Amino acid sequence: MPKQFLALMGKPILHYTLKTFQESGLIDSLVLVVPEKELEHARADWLEHPTIVKQVITGGKQRQDSVFNGYQALPADTDIILVHDGVRPFLSKDMIQETINIAAEFGAAITAIPVNDTIKQVDSFGKVERTLDREGLWRVQTPQAFRYDLLGEAFRKAQKHSFYGTDEGALIENLGQEVRVVDGSEWNLKITRPEDLVLGESILAKLFPEA
């Protein structure tokens, strides 16, 4: 089962993610991108009730392909597009607002937090090659926001040169364009491991006490 459909305090992780977007009042419409085998299940869950989810579509082989599918599903008169990992349910309204504001001004904005751990470069045999200077290093999160036309240009260039980035910010960098950073949060957890669910329940109790 995809991680975003795993239960957190009895509800899918995605429930809390969408709840924050819905209640923020900042999003006009949302395109949900899911694995093909989860398409009908997701449509039944999220399109039967009035929400900002307007379409549920299938993803691609890689993250970049999935985001591109979502991009194509949006109307051409879209101003700002926001990309978010469904398994980050603890984003805040302030993060959404700030990424939108910065993207509107500069074209591209990503949420991130400074690296505070020691970072080692390690070879394929597990041998440490060197210790990296963490000054100026940030751990990137989502949401990430972009002007619609700029992200489209970035996708076209990436496809032309078979470039794959690990996030959409990398596609903008590949254009030679500026990407601005918005403060993220340690609470903006990406739930990918069983132990993340335990931590997520603790965060959930603080952010969604009614859950």
Feature-to-residue mapping (PLM):
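Conserved beta-loop-beta/alpha segment of the NTase-like Rossmann-fold superfamily
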Residues: V53, Q62-S124, Q141
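Acidic helix N-cap motif at the loop->helix transition within catalytic regions
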Residues: E40-D45
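N-terminal glycine-rich phosphate-binding loop and ensuing alpha1 helix
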Residues: M1-L39
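Short, flexible, basic/aromatic active-site loop/helix in glycosyltransferases
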Residues: Q121-F146
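Residues at the starts of beta-strands that form the adenosine-phosphate
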Residues: D28-L30, A108, E178
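Short aromatic/basic micro-patch
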Residues: A7, F90, T131, A145, ...
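Short helix-capping segments at alpha-helix termini
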Residues: S24-L26, L47-I52, A76
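Conserved alpha/beta core of the MobA/IspD/sugar-nucleotide pyrophosphorylase nucleotidyltransferase superfamily
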Residues: W138-A211
